Amino acid sequence: MDNLFTFLHEIEDRYARTIFNFHLISCDEIGDIYGLMKERISSEDMFDNIVYNKDIHHAIKKLVYCDIQLTKHIINQNTYPVFNDSSQVKCCHYFDINSDNSNISSRTVEIFEREKSSLVSYIKTTNKKRKVNYGEIKKTVHGGTNANYFSGKKSDEYLSTTVRSNINQPWIKTISKRMRVDIINHSIVTRGKSSILQTIEIIFTNRTCVKIFKDSTMHIILSKDKDEKGCIHMIDKLFYVYYNLFLLFEDIIQNEYFKEVANVVNHVLTATALDEKLFLIKKMAEHDVYGVSNFKIGMFNLTFIKSLDHTVFPSLLDEDSKIKFFKGKKLNIVALRSLEDCINYVTKSENMIEMMKERSTILNSIDIETESVDRLKELLLK
């Protein structure tokens, strides 16, 4: 981890990170993080009864548990704004909301109606789909006009699905769904699977998302603010997430180790100089501290922050290159999966930029109208 941050610091005058996803590999000695969090979230409907430590309440916006049988969101109401009457309601026509109408539940309903949550994304996506029933096409081919085509409504306790079809092409279906949601206190519950993955999610107020899988491996999607400047800000954001995440684990799992790690993490946060932060991270790696010793890069992107004032020559890019140009002048390096990958493509990017500058200078010095076609091809296509 320290070597990665050292290199990102070396290039931060030219490149800035955009997407940054990473994993914390599960460790047997830590215990069943997924199982214990699942048990706590499943059995409670108040945020305070899940997250006891009030010192970290400001950092956590929502907890989500999703498996085949149940999807449950627990929201931290204090992290949401007070809505006025003109606040847009995003999802009423997709959901039947059942609530006990208490003050706490009513506030949760208000938030749910206005927030673009994963439930809203799921139901909107499934409503948009037009589906071709290939089985019914086969019936048409082999069975003629007597083939049976399904349209109508099918539903269970929590999900109503309406299937419509065109009389001229009855095998093409338009599918609309409406979901029942039960809201009690801080909890938003629906039955059945509403995601591809079975995970627990912790959504932070800074938009970072931590996904915990069944084996307690974690996938962390680190958010980025517009005012993030350089590697030191990135380290602070990552270790801020670590600090609050590990105190949450200590809260739920009752493992003092996480409190100890949170204290070590806090030293990185309070250090003011980048060199000191990197030194502390290196020491954590040497002592096999959780969060550093089991850190693994998932994927990250870099963007070239300087302006490209010369002509861009796309022909210099390999077909499978991770260097991409967007909107003609925006150079990004995408889907980097290791420090070695990063160093390799930054080097290629630097060399390519120099070659483009040279070609651009030559191109600007010649008369395009009188220059030979072969010479122009050599400049533009090779």
Swiss-Prot record:
This protein's encoding gene: OPG150
Subunit record text: Heterodimerizes with protein A8 to form the virus intermediate transcription factor (VITF)-3.
Any Pfam family: Pox_int_trans
Species of origin: Vaccinia virus (strain Copenhagen)
Induction of its expression: Expressed in the early phase of the viral replicative cycle.
Family from the record: Belongs to the orthopoxvirus OPG150 family.
Matches recorded under InterPro entries: Poxvirus_intermed-TF
Keyword Thylakoid carried by entry: no
Domain of life: Viruses
This protein's name: Intermediate transcription factor 3 large subunit
Function: Acts with RNA polymerase to initiate transcription from intermediate gene promoters.
Keywords, alphabetical: Activator, Early protein, Phosphoprotein, Transcription, Transcription regulation
